[in-house]
Amino acid sequence: MEKLFIFKIGGKMLDHAEELEAFLKGFSSIQGRKILVHGGGIFADDLAKKLDIPITMHEGRRITSAPMRDLVTMVYGGLLNKQVVARLQALGCDAIGLSGADGAVLKAKRRKPEPIDYGLVGDIFEVRRDLLETFINHGMTPVLAPLSWEASGEILNSNADGVACKITEAFSGLYETYLFYCFDKPGVLLDVENPASLLAQLDRPAYESLKKQQLVKDGMLPKLDSCFRARTLGAHKVLLSTPTNSLKFAAGADYVGTLIH
């Protein structure tokens, strides 16, 4: 079965031009089929502060008001997405930038307001694999912003980790899917200040235990929830690590990071 590499990168990397450039060079050199999903929460927060738009989070998930939804649409679907696509094109990677509204590629329903009202947040229930597959078959690399589309015509904010998970799920019956969550740590750490506390592997019971001890919390919760969901739904490999280590693993090296079981 042919391999498909799905990378998710976050706002911290997007906020550091040199790190982003190094990653995009490595990503563009990957042979074969690949998809890139990006976040951008740091950019969104910075702009929200300048515009006096309140920022509200719950357990690492953004509560999205109408003004915040408009802001993330501009930031994620506009500036950040097109900057990444422009750099990939310059590096010889034929990329196409998409939000979930483009071709209704990420179909979602607004999350129910109980027990927490997350506002204009979409839970993705369908990925248009046929559309993404068309681009991939033409040698193009889809670059997706974490915005989804509701049938009413509403644009909804969706968690980028969840977007990567749903895309992996959609393709897992067609390809041997490799999902990489790239961030600024080498993986899941028992002590965030000590890289030597890296967990090389993590299964569901161990994760639940870490949650109870509050050794993982905040933004790591939705990330790890997405990791286990992707693994359950057919992902061949799911790795949390740095961009450099993730790229090396995609190129055939032994993994360094946290492999999800």
Regions flagged by a language model, labelled:
Residues 1-261:
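C-terminal catalytic "cap/lid" subdomain
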